[in-house]
Amino acid sequence: MGLLGAAIVAGLAAVGGAIAVAIIVKSTIEGVTRQPELKGTLQTLMFIGVPLAEAVPIIAIVMGFLIMGNA
């Protein structure tokens, strides 16, 4: 059961991270097309937001490894 739980955690974390990054990039592109003069600011915010969105899946994958280690 532990290996299955670890696989589910890793899979859901990867999907969640991909969706979060896609939403952040989509919103940044929409913002730049509406207001091109804010490109630098929006790009900076995107470069801050993407690692924050990826931190949660990385933590979840580490938790999956911990679950796998205890199995």
Curated annotation (Swiss-Prot):
Q: How does it sit in the membrane?
A: Multi-pass membrane protein
Could you state one GO cellular component term attached to this entry? proton-transporting ATP synthase complex
What PROSITE patterns does this protein's entry cite? ATPASE_C
Superkingdom of the source?
Answer: Bacteria
> Can you provide one Gene Ontology molecular function annotated for this UniProt record?
lipid binding
Pfam families found in the cross-reference section: ATP-synt_C
| HAMAP family (UniProt xref) | ATP_synth_c_bact (MF_01396)
**What is the protein name for this chain?**
ATP synthase subunit c
Lineage, top ranks: Bacteria, Bacillati, Bacillota, Bacilli, Bacillales
Gene that encodes it: atpE
